[in-house]
């Protein structure tokens, strides 16, 4: 251990058997900051592990940790597909209480909506997951199956391109009209194309109403 001027522990050093990776601390000249580097093998992480509920801080602010990010896309930001569109609607609950901007998905056949996103540059261009926020139009408790598929398009690419493989998620009707419903998190959705920075990603969202497992008999309202 390294002790401070009062004899208290300042830094504890723990040995690892057969270690090959280490930290290198370099000082700096005027106008430059010191550098803490991982050295050893070709690709080496630096692991900083706070204790308990502690967080990493820069100056006095907590450092944002990269990981799973969420993005809210409401029905009002979507548009009905030209072919087999879901029906856009504004549904009043009670006067001067929340109105719902929704897309209505019928039980008889597949309906579709679309939207697009230019993801933040911090996105790793990997798979995504999703949850559907919806509300039932009836008290039926059958299973409603939602689906999502996507494709990324870059500068100079054609937008006339097929969506990737759809991934579905199933949610049973809650049995109460106008109750909020949130599906489970879907499995991974692979976006078609070659996702990269500065691309626009198009999504198609639908109700898989004509598949045998969709037994919800009412209109499913996507929020």
Question: At which residue positions do the language-model features occur?
Answer:
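Short beta-strands within extracellular/lumenal beta-sheet-rich domains
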Residues: 106-122
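Beta-strand-rich, repetitive solenoid scaffolds
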Residues: 1-5, 10-41, 45-51, 55-60, ...
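Proprotein-processing/basic-patch segments
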Residues: 206-223
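Noncatalytic modules at the cell exterior or secretory-pathway interfaces
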Residues: 194-210
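Extracellular carbohydrate recognition and processing domains
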Residues: 157-193
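Short coil-to-beta strand junction motifs in C2/discoidin
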Residues: 140-147, 218-222
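Short carbohydrate-recognition loop motifs
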Residues: 93-108
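A short beta-strand element within beta-rich, extracytoplasmic domains
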Residues: 126-136, 144
């Amino acid at each position: 251990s390294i002790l401070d001027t009062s004899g208290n522990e300042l830094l504890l050093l723990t040995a690892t058997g057969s270690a090959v990776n280490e930290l290198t601390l370099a000082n700096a000249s005027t106008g430059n900051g010191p550098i803490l580097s991982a050295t050893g093998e070709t690709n080496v992480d630096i692991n900083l592990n706070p204790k308990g509920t502690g967080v990493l801080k820069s100056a006095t602010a907590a450092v944002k940790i990269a990981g799973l990010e969420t993005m809210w896309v409401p029905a009002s930001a979507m548009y009905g597909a030209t072919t087999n569109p879901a029906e856009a609607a504004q549904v009043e609950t009670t006067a001067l209480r929340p109105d719902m901007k929704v897309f209505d998905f019928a039980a008889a056949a597949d309906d579709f909506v679309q939207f697009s996103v230019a993801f933040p540059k911090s996105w790793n261009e990997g798979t995504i997951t999703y949850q559907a926020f919806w509300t039932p139009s009836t008290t039926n408790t059958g299973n409603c199956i939602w689906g999502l598929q996507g494709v990324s398009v870059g500068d100079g690419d054609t937008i006339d391109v097929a969506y990737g493989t759809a991934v579905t998620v199933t949610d049973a009707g809650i049995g109460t009209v106008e109750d909020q419903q949130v599906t489970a998190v879907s499995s991974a959705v692979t976006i078609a194309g070659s996702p990269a920075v500065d691309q626009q990603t198009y999504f198609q969202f639908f109700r898989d109403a004509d598949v045998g497992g969709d037994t919800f008999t009412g209109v499913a309202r996507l929020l």
